[in-house]
Amino acid sequence: MFERKIFSQHYEGAVKPFKIIGNVYFVGCIPASSHLIDTGDGLILIDTGYEDTLFMLVDSVYRLGFQLSDIKYIIHTHWHSDHTAATMGLVALTGAKTFIGHKDAENAKTYFVPDEVLRTGDRICLGNTEIDILETPGHTKGCISLFFNTEANGKTYRVGMFGGAGVNTLTPGHYEYPDCVADYLNSLKQLRQENVDVFIGNHVWNNDTCKKGELLLRGEKNYFIDADIWHTFLNFCEQRVKNVNGI
């Protein structure tokens, strides 16, 4: 679990789109995740992926029975190309409003011009969904994490995403910015204060997205529902960044 694979190209392949739980869907590729939230008044998309996987995302939206025009908001967890490079094309197709953490806004202009910037305590509301924003710097200076509720089987589940778990920018000689490691460790402390029932990743390796999705599509148990895996993953992230930095 939590194995980070290194790919020789931007993407390894397509993933059949599927409903994770409630109004939350996976529409990403391997290795970069994208998620749709059906708010009842339009779709919220979390991360757009690579420019050369835009066709996969568009196909996934249609396969799930939605229209591109349903996408109203696009939220980006951070500015790196595997989460933002398809945004300009998707905005041209949808007219969606774009959001990113305020400290990543300038770098994001490499790929698109954000409409709104986000800070801790901000809440994005559309239809039946309210997404709470937490700044979690480290992987990038403006990385954000997201938390919201979804309903399924007569229950309310808290969904959470850590917006930047990767340590490629936290490795000696490759730091994203000064003090990024200290920021990352502090972000983990903040994230541990959140209770999460359904952990979604912004890369498929974060939470075994593909394996769990395949089981769901076969009608088996929903392994995305797990109140323990959030903290297990955060502990893994802490140990990994300490290992690569000799802490």
PLM regions: where:
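Short, basic/low-complexity N-terminal boundary segments at the transition from targeting/disordered tails
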Residues: M1-K16, K97
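Conserved beta-strand hairpin/beta-sheet module of binuclear metal-dependent hydrolase folds
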Residues: H10-L64, S145-V167
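Short Gly/Pro-enriched turn/cap motifs at secondary-structure boundaries
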Residues: V15-K16, Y25-V27, V113-E116, E135-H139
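Divalent metal-coordination and catalytic microenvironments
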Residues: N23, I37, D47, L57, ...
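Active-site HxH/HxHxD metal-binding segment of metal-dependent hydrolases
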Residues: V24, D52-F55, V61-C125, F224-F233
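Metallo-beta-lactamase
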Residues: L43, Y50-D52, R123, E130-T232, ...
